[in-house]
Amino acid sequence: MFVPRSLKIKRNANDDGKSCVAKIIKPDPEDLQLDKSRDVPVDAVATEAATIDRHISESCPFPSPGGQLAEVHSVSPEQGAKDSHPSEEPVKSFSKTQRWAEPGEPICVVCGRYGEYICDKTDEDVCSLECKAKHLLQVKEKEEKSKLSNPQKADSEPESPLNASYVYKEHPFILNLQEDQIENLKQQLGILVQGQEVTRPIIDFEHCSLPEVLNHNLKKSGYEVPTPIQMQMIPVGLLGRDILASADTGSGKTAAFLLPVIMRALFESKTPSALILTPTRELAIQIERQAKELMSGLPRMKTVLLVGGLPLPPQLYRLQQHVKVIIATPGRLLDIIKQSSVELCGVKIVVVDEADTMLKMGFQQQVLDILENIPNDCQTILVSATIPTSIEQLASQLLHNPVRIITGEKNLPCANVRQIILWVEDPAKKKKLFEILNDKKLFKPPVLVFVDCKLGADLLSEAVQKITGLKSISIHSEKSQIERKNILKGLLEGDYEVVVSTGVLGRGLDLISVRLVVNFDMPSSMDEYVHQIGRVGRLGQNGTAITFINNNSKRLFWDIAKRVKPTGSILPPQLLNSPYLHDQKRKEQQKDKQTQNDLVTGANLMDIIRKHDKSNSQK
């Protein structure tokens, strides 16, 4: 049998309290045609249906309207008459009667329809009794093939390959390295660490002594060698230390916190035991996908996605299925907490991803309200591409004896990105963009173009397709969640040559296929600039970022010069000769000089005393 996600029972006065009435659904002609090719033993489905009926006749949990589990027991005819409701549907027998899944909803592992139920034997999502029977047959056949191909391994392998607990210990290879070798390694890789008694970085994932299943999943997902941030952050996280981490965009921060999350949740009995907070739906969906890839094959490891823009009832019900890891946006999770539909007292590790974006989007108080429901001894990890002063202040509030890990220079663009700054007046921007898209050396589809408004994104996308003939599409916050998900999928699969976007794609998303970014409109801050050009250069890949500037960005001229020029990029003469740049430079130098004068040193001590005496005498 399996556990239904949202099962409803009809009770009439004449019923015995145990019967189910099916909702009649007319199948689509396509479904009927597809079903002719299906070959499922009818007796398997019938047996499963009988089992479900027996299960329903006993005490069985169902979700109440408020999202809480309610016990359903046999009731008397009198009570049944009181509680009778309009006709409601039972467990679906055939997949053709099940609807297709909406974005973010669980998907049947057999046919891809809405995974309304969870198979109790495998914890996989299925849509009907038919697909459950198919799924169990597939599992059985796979097990038999595995035994035939390697009988000795099948006999020797224990049912549960995991130990009762996990404690990270430094690998003998790492222990045998000299201290100067470790320091040289950190220096060569650009790893800066601050904190007390910080463990050494790993050089290979196998140095963590992770379960074999997890090591296999890492390789399958393309993680061959850890990146610098992963080398230091993973062992520190596995030891349970609080962390404030900053690294270049695309440096592998997600996997760096997912491994400690998985290992912590794997050996915890309480559910949920891990929480990951992200500022946007798209980032949450991406993190859950990566988490599922790494968790595949690990026992009792389930995730739930709690984000706005997707139906709430399936999320509430999924919460009741003993999920280990919650991946959520602050607003949706706080709403669920206020409904008392989730308990976070068992959470042992919390990750706040893209923490600086959280603050800029006004989520700081929501994050703090959520963390008030977390135990005080919970491990906390703050992750971001940049660490402004506001993040430093938040870290001082949330973290206890933290380890600060920084790879690359704070708040600087990724070194793998070739940056080109062009002076382009507003009327000439479209023409310049079309020139870039027609340049064989620069044009490497798909190209991501950033603009500063939604209407501008739509109009520019239409112009690109009309003038250049390239397949172009726009994406922004006014597009529906389904549209945005399909556009993202199309971008990753190469369906679009140009995507024109507002800042919705500027943070956190791994767009591995993108090699060229054009900032059609200069972002409003250098932090946003860092994130937007960071859509290229992901995970060590090289890329190019072209930015159009003019006097509309005059307040950022000195910041652009300071941060971009050291990378070797040639800046346009209009920028270097701008009076705005020189004025900003002069003001900053005066500010620095004033700061130095305010510092009391042996050299200026007497001057400060004389100045103080003079000001007092004038009074």
From Swiss-Prot:
Changing P77T: In a breast cancer sample; somatic mutation. Keywords: ATP-binding, Ciliopathy, Cytoplasm, Disease variant, Helicase, Hydrolase, Isopeptide bond, Metal-binding, Nucleotide-binding, Nucleus, Phosphoprotein, RNA-binding, Ubl conjugation, Zinc, Zinc-finger. This is Probable ATP-dependent RNA helicase DDX59. Interacts (via HIT-type zinc finger) with the RUVBL1/RUVBL2 complex in the presence of ADP. The modification Phosphoserine is found at S64, S76, S156, S160. GO terms for molecular function: ATP binding; ATP hydrolysis activity; mRNA binding; RNA helicase activity; zinc ion binding. It is linked to Orofaciodigital syndrome 5: A form of orofaciodigital syndrome, a group of heterogeneous disorders characterized by malformations of the oral cavity, face and digits, and associated phenotypic abnormalities that lead to the delineation of various subtypes. OFD5 patients show the core features of cleft palate, lobulated tongue, and polydactyly. Additional features include frontal bossing and intellectual disability. It comes from Homo sapiens. It catalyses: ATP + H2O = ADP + phosphate + H(+). It is found in: Cytoplasm; Nucleus. A motif (Q motif) lies at residues 203-231. The keyword Oxidoreductase does not apply. A zinc finger (HIT-type) spans 104-133.
